[in-house]
Amino acid sequence: MYYKRIRELREDNDILQKDVAKVLNTTQQHYSRIENGSTEITADRIVTLAKFYNVTSDYILGLIDSKER
């Protein structure tokens, strides 16, 4: 699921939830719910995260396993 990928990307890059929340223009609490899978993420936020982490949206969605763009 996508939420595992976005948590993995954040942790691998040593980034705090509050910092990713700022990128997404949301609160840390809301981002935490996205990362835990209890709240869905919108397509535009997936694209924003893909650009932020320099990966494809397909990688975040789990459609491919390569992080390469």
What is each stretch, according to the model?
Residues 25-40:
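Recognition helix of helix-turn-helix/homeodomain-like DNA-binding domains
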Residues 40-41, 60:
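Short amphipathic alpha-helical segment with a characteristic S/N-K-E followed by hydrophobic residues
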Residues 12, 59-69:
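Short, charged recognition helix plus adjacent turn
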Residues 35, 53, 64:
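DNA major-groove recognition helix of helix-turn-helix
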Residues 4-23, 48:
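Short basic helix-loop element that most often maps to the first helix and adjoining turn
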Residues 6, 20-21, 31-34, 60:
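Conserved hydrophobic/aromatic packing and binding residues within compact polymer-binding modules
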